[in-house]
Amino acid sequence: FKGGAFEVLHDAETNFSIFHAMGGMADGNAVIAKINPHEDISSALETLIHRAGFARANIHGIGSLIGAAFDGAPPMTSPISEVLIPPGAIWNGALHLPMECVDPDNGQYAGLLTKGRAPVCVTFEVMIVAT
């Protein structure tokens, strides 16, 4: 991955200094992006991948969510969390998005994210790499 970076800049919506994706190349093999508050993380990732035209990709990221529902696992109900996309998150024509979350009470949650049930809290930074 060449040409792109995250820079810390003031964000008027959140009133925080947060990462913003900068630079990049139109014909690159990867995308970096900041996903904004209240966007569903799954839907936002699918949109980014479709725009990039990737048939297959690995997905990496960190951020915060306002609650999260998981397929076959207990939900994370806190309106505040810190989140990691662990290894194994992929796009292969469909999104396979494992997620690990921790809430302010140190409650820990993990599983495959349910599409449409995980809005971004403050921000989410992602890197999508074509495979």
Q: Which residue stretches match the model-derived regions?
A:
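Mixed-charge, glycine-accented linear interaction segment located at domain edges/termini
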Residues: 1-20, 35, 102-131
